[in-house]
């Protein structure tokens, strides 16, 4: 049964007009459903029919918003990257370096823990050579990382952080925070039910923040 709100038919998401509120809601429903399907089955193993079923939407209604499976897949990945870039963009060059990095790491950990499917989907895309979002990585992502690397380098030059290569610091933050989503099965195999125990997320954040931030605090 199609449980989405019916579109009016007067405006097409494929056109240049601003989407209506109903269209925006249905688009989010599709992207959420597609994320779950793609993260489990991968791009090749997923079908539009599976996504439509997950979204509780008819296939023709879904195809009104996205013409092809490839279009849905790209939209899901770009939506994920937009969310991930937001806390990096928010890093303030005029703020306290340790606190700015603390906020960034905390936000990245929360994203991995709250939406592990998105992290795993992105990891699979990159492992496949980023055939869909390679241009995004080489342009928008690179441009933002270059800007924030200069911010970190300025903090180091002013003695507000210990000497560290800004790119490797950013890579380390990504690797550490996304590990808890991408390698959830491995973590559960080692620590078992502790993963779901109260306080595990806080312990994770405390450990990661302690290691990273203590490693880059200015030396006396």
State each model region's role.
Residues 1-14, 110, 114, 142-162, ...:
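C-terminal peripheral helix-coil segments that are non-catalytic and often amphipathic
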Residues 2, 29, 37-71, 75:
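Helix-turn-helix
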Residues 26, 30-38, 108, 212:
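Short hydrophobic clusters on alpha-helical segments that form packing/core surfaces
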Residues 26, 69, 76, 80, ...:
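Hydrophobic/aromatic residues within well-ordered alpha-helical segments
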Residues 40-44, 115, 158:
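Short coil/turn segments at alpha/beta junctions that flank glycine-rich nucleotide-binding fingerprints
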Residues 74-103, 151-153:
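Amphipathic alpha-helical linker/stalk segments
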Residues 89-120, 166-173, 202:
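Hydrophobic alpha-helical connector segments
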Residues 113-135, 183-192:
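Amphipathic alpha-helical segments used for helix-helix packing
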């Amino acid at each position: 049964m199609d449980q989405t709100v019916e579109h009016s038919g007067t405006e097409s998401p494929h056109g240049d007009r601003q989407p209506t509120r109903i269209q925006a809601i249905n688009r989010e429903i599709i992207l959420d459903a597609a994320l779950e399907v793609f993260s489990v089955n991968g791009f090749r193993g997923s079908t539009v029919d599976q996504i439509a079923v997950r979204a509780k939407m008819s296939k023709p209604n879904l195809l009104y918003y996205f013409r092809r499976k490839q279009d849905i897949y790209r939209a899901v990945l770009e939506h994920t990257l937009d969310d991930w870039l937001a806390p990096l963009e928010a890093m303030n060059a005029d703020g306290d370096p340790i606190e700015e990095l603390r906020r960034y790491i905390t936000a990245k950990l929360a994203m991995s823990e709250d939406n592990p499917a998105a992290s795993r989907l992105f990891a699979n895309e990159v492992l496949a050579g980023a055939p869909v979002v390679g241009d995004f990585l080489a342009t928008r992502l690179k441009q933002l990382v270059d800007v924030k690397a200069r911010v970190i380098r300025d903090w180091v030059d002013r003695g507000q952080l210990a000497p560290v290569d800004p790119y490797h610091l950013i890579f380390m933050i990504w690797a550490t925070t996304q590990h808890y989503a991408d390698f959830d099965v491995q973590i559960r195999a080692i620590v078992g039910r502790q993963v779901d125990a109260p306080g595990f997320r806080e312990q994770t954040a405390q450990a990661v923040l302690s290691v990273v931030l203590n490693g880059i605090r200015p030396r006396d």
